[in-house]
């Protein structure tokens, strides 16, 4: 995946934050070459409960603040526990409850996007 160093470090911090709270099915969607895409990359993960969605969101915030000194410009959906979207400018984080991820299938929106899957950590 081609990303500027700063974006790469941000993605790594996001993934660590997700893994810290046992987020599953972590996938990055490389959108940097797609003109109509809203950002360079999506980081998507699945959670088993609304409480875990919230915990992963908090963890991602903590890890990005500590490791790369970045805060999201916006966080949407925090109250509902189904789908939280975190906007880091070049990177958007999508934290889904299992049913919501299956329903929205964000990974499939761009056919020519490169997907990278990360192993689940137990």
Predicted regions and their residues:
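Conserved acidic residues
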Residues: 40, 90
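Active-site beta-strand termini and strand-to-loop segments that position acidic
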Residues: 86-88
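Glycine/threonine-rich flexible loop motifs
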Residues: 103-104
């Amino acid at each position: 995946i081609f990303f500027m160093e700063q974006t790469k470090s941000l993605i790594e911090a996001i993934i660590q934050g997700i893994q810290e709270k046992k987020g599953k099915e972590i996938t990055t969607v490389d959108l940097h070459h797609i003109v109509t895409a809203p950002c360079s990359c999506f980081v998507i993960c699945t959670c088993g409960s609304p409480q875990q969605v919230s915990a992963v969101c908090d963890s991602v915030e903590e890890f990005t603040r500590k490791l790369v000194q970045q805060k999201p410009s916006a966080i949407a959906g925090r109250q509902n526990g189904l789908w939280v979207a975190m906007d880091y400018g070049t990177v958007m984080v999508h934290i889904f409850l299992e049913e919501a991820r299956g329903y929205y299938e964000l990974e499939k929106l761009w056919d020519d996007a490169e997907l990278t899957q990360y192993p689940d950590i137990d």
